[in-house]
């Protein structure tokens, strides 16, 4: 039975894990790292994912996409998208359906597509380790992701060639990994501050039962924001000193971003770090190069980002209130996400909850490990684990006057189903439009519109008379289906909610085909590179053999080999793998004649020597030796 893999699709880094016997384990990627940068780079000739993409980001900033998770399921015009446009060097554009997409080298990509490229890398990592094809996965999302963002993540899995068996919340996955072997009853808080999102989840764990009591968060708060605070500080200081605005130069901005991330990491273990960026700009008056050499202290960093850390504590208050527990009721605080390595974050969390956080989990890997456990549960490999998650935001419809009428409150355990009867607002109304929203505001317009549909052919009747039953159904992935039924006629209409724009089935199928075509193209490119390497290696070894042994063979053999070498050199200039293979075959055959000639020549040389020295008897090779028989006594 093929393995189901667990994937933590992160804003900054991603990670893949599997169940290895009774325990989950993280799989190293082709570079030997346990996490992979969630970065996709586009060059003239290829698409790079992970570390190779990160390495070329400074020289190719406009065509390198990072932190795309912050755009997934979002619309152009959203405040978060407008903010992101100012922070990233690549283009964020309208996808044509109102969704925020990215444009690279004149081609538009949906965030789901970019995420799919990262998921493909995770899939390939698992396949290389397992030695078999992987088709199913559990993928994690921030607990505070709305329906559109969850649906877009599921679409990304489909584009990557994966059947997504479950979308699981990141803090819940972390709790699974933390509590898998724990038998006692505990109430825990999972504080998850990652690269782009923040979640706080309160859970009760009781001998294999994981029950989420509440969740809260901010899907636009994370390490990327901390990095940008440092970038802005460095750019401001440089402008004060040299009068040059580095934020206008995409390449300089990318260098600053990498320097900021490195400095932030270093300041988690040291009090001061130096940021050294030579030749980062040029003096417009003198034409002389300008260098950035600055010191950054931990205290300065903490002053730059203090409000961001404080911002994470408000959702913690809300989550405790919704769960009906106090800070003193929390038995353990589990820290998740790379940003929780920052000492000031740990201090603030300790102060807030009144206890030292648990440090027994790797914050970068624990979510992927939890996803692997959930995969094991679904596959039947992990027994006695029951997971009860919740929907993070209230769901409802718009009613008369633009009011948001809730059908399912936030923190309701999922899967769940809820129905409510509504009626018409006008006499003889023959159709109703059901507009579905998600959020906590009282007016529908202030919440997130998930989608809408019409129920038509309602028989004419006075207002308030028709009975229209609206049913919300949320599955275990947190994805919403809505139906409306006229109880008088039995006529019904239903939809699985997609983002207001969203990807249609046709869009997804096209992207799946593109991904498959790209996979085939990548395979051909790899085959071409390997064939070229083989050809160059053969040329080198043959050339060396001619230099050393060319005088031992007749000139016609050498000439034939040199002709074959010339033909292969020409073939190597092309991009035709078949032509190169033909050249390799011809040179291999010609080089074999060289080997045969060398072997015959050495045999001839070796065979002439004994005749010149004259015949020898068999005894010539025997050496006489005297020995003394010790006898029995002498042997003892």
UniProtKB/Swiss-Prot annotation:
UniProt KW Glycoprotein keyword: no
Induction text: By stress conditions e.g. heat shock.
Keywords, alphabetical: ATP-binding, Chaperone, Nucleotide-binding, Phosphoprotein, Stress response
Region (Disordered): 602-636
Positions bearing Phosphothreonine: 197
InterPro entries the record matches: ATPase_NBD, Chaperone_DnaK, Heat_shock_70_CS, HSP70_C_sf, HSP70_peptide-bd_sf, Hsp_70_fam
Matches recorded under HAMAP family: DnaK (MF_00332)
Protein name: Chaperone protein DnaK
Lineage, top ranks: Bacteria, Pseudomonadati, Pseudomonadota, Alphaproteobacteria, Rhodobacterales
Gene name as annotated: dnaK
